[in-house]
């Protein structure tokens, strides 16, 4: 029976080292000690997650509690997991008070170090998508299986606890039992940025060059008349998008899984602001604003899984059933032809193009170099770490953003700069309210946040700097928009920031 203190100690060891090898060894050592019923919750806690999602406890409740700490550790992983499940099940009149009482009882049994860990775990402050890669390597080491087998199972399940349970219980045989399941979302394949269109074309040869639309990523699953639609973070939005459900039901197939984008268009066919598209996914979504789907991949068709087939074959399947809803694209090895569609995409109001090798398999959940994205300016998706109170016209608003890049070795986000450029009055008002809901602590001028909000930043380039721990700083950064469709695990890494060069037209060589 493993104690929570063992998880806390291991988590501290992982946070204290920059060595990926040491992180993997520490986590694998603890995973190998967990009993069968402890593997799921133990894996989740180590990753800074809760198995069933949020427990319905906010920072206001957590910060109001201050019970005396226990002198010696006694809480087990199983007891904490059961208490969190109980918190989640509380509802009805007086639920807030009952949650506070249950939480106070739990914290009273915890040592000071365990209390700090539990508060950060329940508040979402420990969630680090960057730790996923380290966790997967540790699961493989603890179970004595190939890392590729663990990664593939995770791609298909989308859940670290389930992947760890399968690996430690049944090894590669049980991991091999994970399949693409229609109705269960899988993690989307991601693209790496290319500096220029010529660079991408030279690397990949014959490619599909597609519009990179200014929309939201969707994954569509259909089995008969049963349709489910998910965002890039695997959140189900089916009930919010009835027009997409109706369209997918009309496709000439029995079962299908499609990857694509959706967006709202104005009367001239140009994309409406991204926030309007994302507004359709909320509880108060404006149903009179119709969404249009544009699909670019087919992962399953009528009982056949297509993930491991080359893109050219998946596009053939897509053409069979959804030709009228394909994203604008050309298949070519000619740079001049590709440059034409790049210009067309920009003229139509979109972000740029995607360049994809026709030989590429679908690497779910991974950011590979067989898919490249090309834009006319540098942009990065970064995590908001904190914000400073403004001065003058911005007085009373949280304004200057502290921006962090993802640590590929599983550490906390690495600060790379600050900016208040590009913030409209509307955004200032929104983030001042939103940031205080996500606050972890504050000092005289700065409010620090749970590192989970992603913001898209445009910049001229980066420069070497000793001011920030990553050794680089953003140049002339400005806010383009917040990305509610992305989580911190989708943010750009510090390596991606370092690779950014100075301004140049993305379609040009050199």
Curated annotation (Swiss-Prot):
| EC category | ligase
Reactions catalysed, as given in the entry: ATP + (deoxyribonucleotide)n-3'-hydroxyl + 5'-phospho-(deoxyribonucleotide)m = (deoxyribonucleotide)n+m + AMP + diphosphate
Q: Where is the active site?
A: 212
Tell whether Aminoacyl-tRNA synthetase is among the UniProt keywords.
no
Cofactor(s) the protein requires to work: Mg(2+)
Q: Which domain of life is it from?
A: Bacteria
* Record bears the keyword DNA damage: yes
- Protein residues bound to ATP: 210, 217, 232, 261, 296, 367, 373
EC code(s) of this entry:
6.5.1.1
- Keywords, sorted A to Z: ATP-binding, Cell cycle, Cell division, DNA damage, DNA recombination, DNA repair, DNA replication, Ligase, Magnesium, Metal-binding, Nucleotide-binding
Q: Report the InterPro entries cross-referenced here.
A: ATP-dep_DNA_ligase, DNA_ligae_ATP-dep_bac/arc, DNA_ligase_ATP-dep, DNA_ligase_ATP-dep_C, DNA_ligase_ATP-dep_cent, DNA_ligase_ATP-dep_CS, DNA_ligase_ATP-dep_N, DNA_ligase_N_sf
Q: Name one GO molecular function term.
A: metal ion binding
A biological process term (GO) from this entry: DNA repair
- Spell out the PROSITE patterns in the cross-references: DNA_LIGASE_A1, DNA_LIGASE_A3
Would you identify the family this protein belongs to, as annotated?
Answer: Belongs to the ATP-dependent DNA ligase family.
The cross-references to HAMAP family, in alphabetical order and at most eight, read: DNA_ligase
What functional role does this protein have? DNA ligase that seals nicks in double-stranded DNA during DNA replication, DNA recombination and DNA repair.
Q: What is this protein called?
A: Probable DNA ligase
């Amino acid at each position: 029976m493993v104690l929570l203190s063992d998880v806390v100690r291991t988590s501290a060891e992982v946070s204290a080292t920059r060595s990926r090898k040491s992180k993997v060894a520490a986590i694998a050592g603890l995973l190998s000690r967990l009993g069968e019923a402890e593997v799921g919750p133990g894996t989740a806690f180590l990753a800074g997650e809760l198995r069933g999602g949020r427990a319905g406890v906010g920072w206001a409740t957590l910060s109001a509690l201050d019970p005396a700490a226990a002198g010696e550790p006694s809480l087990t992983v199983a007891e904490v997991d059961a208490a969190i499940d109980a918190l989640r099940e509380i509802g009805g009149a007086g639920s807030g008070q009952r949650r506070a009482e249950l939480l106070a009882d739990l914290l009273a049994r915890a040592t000071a170090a365990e209390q700090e860990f539990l508060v950060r775990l329940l508040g979402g402050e420990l969630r680090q998508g960057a730790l996923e890669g380290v966790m997967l390597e540790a699961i493989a080491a603890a179970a004595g299986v190939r890392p590729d087998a663990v990664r593939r199972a995770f791609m298909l399940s989308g859940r670290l606890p389930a992947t760890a349970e399968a690996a430690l219980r049944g090894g590669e045989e049980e991991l091999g039992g994970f399949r693409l399941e229609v109705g269960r979302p899988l993690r989307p394949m991601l693209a790496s940025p290319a500096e220029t269109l010529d660079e991408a074309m030279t690397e990949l040869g014959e490619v599909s060059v597609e519009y990179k639309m200014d929309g939201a990523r969707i994954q569509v699953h259909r089995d008969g008349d049963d349709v489910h639609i998910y965002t890039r973070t695997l959140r189900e939005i089916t009930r919010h998008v009835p027009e997409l459900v109706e369209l997918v039901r009309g496709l000439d197939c029995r079962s299908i899984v499609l990857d694509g984008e959706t967006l709202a268009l104005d009367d001239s066919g140009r994309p409406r602001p991204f926030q309007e598209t994302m507004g359709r996914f909320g509880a108060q979504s404006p149903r009179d604003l119709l969404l249009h789907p544009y699909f670019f991949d087919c992962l399953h068709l009528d009982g056949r899984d297509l993930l491991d087939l080359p893109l050219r074959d998946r596009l053939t399947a897509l053409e069979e059933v959804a030709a009228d809803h394909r994203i604008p694209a050309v298949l070519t090895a000619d740079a001049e032809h590709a440059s034409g569609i790049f210009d067309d995409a920009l003229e139509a109001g979109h972000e740029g193009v995607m360049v994809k090798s026709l030989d590429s398999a679908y690497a779910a959940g991974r950011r590979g170099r067989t898919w490249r994205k090309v834009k006319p300016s540098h942009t990065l998706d970064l995590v908001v770490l904190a914000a400073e109170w403004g001065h003058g016209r911005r007085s009373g608003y949280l304004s200057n953003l502290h921006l962090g890049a993802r640590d590929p070795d599983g550490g906390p986000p690495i600060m790379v700069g600050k900016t208040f450029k590009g913030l409209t009055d509307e955004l200032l008002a929104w983030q001042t309210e939103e940031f205080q809901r996500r606050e972890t602590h504050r000092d005289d001028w700065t409010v620090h946040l749970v590192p989970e909000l992603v913001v898209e930043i445009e910049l001229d380039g980066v420069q070497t700097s000793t001011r920030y721990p990553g050794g680089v700083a953003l140049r002339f950064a400005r806010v383009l928009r917040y990305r509610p469709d992305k989580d911190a695990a989708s943010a750009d890494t510090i390596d991606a920031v370092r690779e950014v060069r100075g301004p140049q037209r993305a379609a040009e060589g050199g």
